């Protein structure tokens, strides 16, 4: 499958052949894409939520009042779960939310996400993702030429430092090396910009 190579000025400068097994899968598997996104989001969760149990709450262990004769229900401790300021029964604990997902499925998810963007016409190949100076205003003007609201930019094995610094303060714009290409960011951004180097490295990686 052939597609245009664009410059950062959004002008056609050539043509590139894309591997159809990676960028033009015939049937897009949304279920696989969702599986991978769920796996990514679960892995990213901090899991540091926690409540205190009866044994962890600070307070006395003294019986609040005598067993009989008060007319109240019997109580053994002010730290019990039914008492105000007491512990929490079956509350959240610190844990990892990460789940396991086979590499084969993760790879398929990336392929189908790239194919989906390509089918929408929102995957663009750029000849070079390099800037002379790390100027945010200059990069904003460049991205405005593509008329998109959000951009996921994938470079080769290394990201141009000037491009990276310029993109830091731009809302909904993320730049990563090819190893950082992931399904969640591809789907949640409107446009995916790939450098020529990124295309060749991704095709080699996902073959």
UniProtKB/Swiss-Prot annotation:
Domain of life: Bacteria
Database matches in Gene3D superfamilies: 3.40.1370.10
Sorted UniProt keywords: Ribonucleoprotein, Ribosomal protein, RNA-binding, rRNA-binding
A Pfam family hit: Ribosomal_L4
Cellular component terms per the entry's GO annotation: ribonucleoprotein complex; ribosome
GO biological process terms, semicolon-separated: translation
One Gene Ontology molecular-function label: structural constituent of ribosome
Protein family (similarity comment): Belongs to the universal ribosomal protein uL4 family.
PANTHER family registered for this protein in UniProt: 50S RIBOSOMAL PROTEIN L4, LARGE RIBOSOMAL SUBUNIT PROTEIN UL4M
HAMAP family registered for this protein in UniProt: Ribosomal_uL4_B
Purpose: One of the primary rRNA binding proteins, this protein initially binds near the 5'-end of the 23S rRNA. It is important during the early stages of 50S assembly. It makes multiple contacts with different domains of the 23S rRNA in the assembled 50S subunit and ribosome. Forms part of the polypeptide exit tunnel.
Subunit comment: Part of the 50S ribosomal subunit.
Entry protein name: Large ribosomal subunit protein uL4
Organism: Rickettsia conorii (strain ATCC VR-613 / Malish 7)
């Amino acid at each position: 499958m052939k597609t245009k190579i664009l410059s950062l000025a959004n002008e056609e400068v050539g043509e590139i052949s894309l591997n159809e097994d990676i960028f033009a899968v015939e049937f897009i598997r949304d279920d696989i894409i969702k599986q991978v996104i769920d796996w990514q989001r679960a892995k990213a969760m901090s899991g540091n939520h926690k409540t205190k149990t009866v044994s962890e709450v600070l307070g006395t262990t003294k019986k609040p009042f005598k067993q009989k004769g008060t007319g109240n229900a019997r109580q053994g401790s002010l730290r019990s779960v039914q008492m105000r300021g007491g512990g929490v029964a079956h509350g959240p604990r610190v844990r990892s939310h990460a789940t396991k997902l086979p590499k084969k499925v993760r790879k398929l998810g990336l392929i189908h996400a790239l194919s989906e963007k390509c089918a929408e016409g929102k995957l663009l190949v750029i000849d070079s993702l390099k800037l002379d100076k790390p100027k945010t205003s200059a990069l904003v003007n460049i991205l405005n030429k593509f008329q998109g609201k959000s951009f996921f930019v994938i470079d080769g094995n290394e990201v141009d430092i000037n491009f990276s610094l310029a993109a830091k303060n731009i809302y909904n714009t993320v730049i990563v090396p090819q190893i950082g290409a992931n399904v969640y960011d591809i789907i949640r951004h409107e446009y995916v910009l790939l450098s020529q180097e990124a295309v060749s490295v991704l095709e080699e990686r996902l073959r």
